[in-house]
Amino acid sequence: MRILHVEDDEDTRTLVAFVLQGAGWDVVAVDSAKAAMETAANGAFDLYLLDNWIGGDTEHALCRGLRCLDPKTPILFYSGAAFPMDVETALACGAQAYLTKPCTPEALIEAIAKLTCG
């Protein structure tokens, strides 16, 4: 399985890639919405994993852009923003699920597996 992970925090990007690669998945990690759209346009992914805030801006425009580019691939927001409005907005933009940081590696793997394996 191939995952596009969009996260502006380098430590979080590295840790998440380590966890997901340990689960046997291929991870392409980028640090901006622009890089995410370019990467998604040039390759197929099984899941998009998005932080809610990238460089001081929300990723809702990215979520909508990914949804237009690829209407079927699941989108999972993985963010420290835990207000109900954050979750509602992400889902309204086309995401299938929202997971709040921090969580255990097992919870992240389980959330991804649920979206990609049924």
Give the location of each predicted region.
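C-terminal output helix
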Residues: C103-A113
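Conserved acidic carboxylate
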Residues: E7
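Two-component/phosphorelay signaling modules centered on CheY-like receiver
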Residues: E10-V28
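Short amphipathic alpha-helix used as the core "switch/output" element in two-component signaling
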Residues: H60-P71
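Acidic, metal-coordinating helix/loop segments flanking the phosphotransfer/catalytic sites
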Residues: A29-L47, E88
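Alpha4 helix (beta4-alpha4-beta5 surface) of REC/receiver domains from two-component response regulators
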Residues: A61, A82-A97
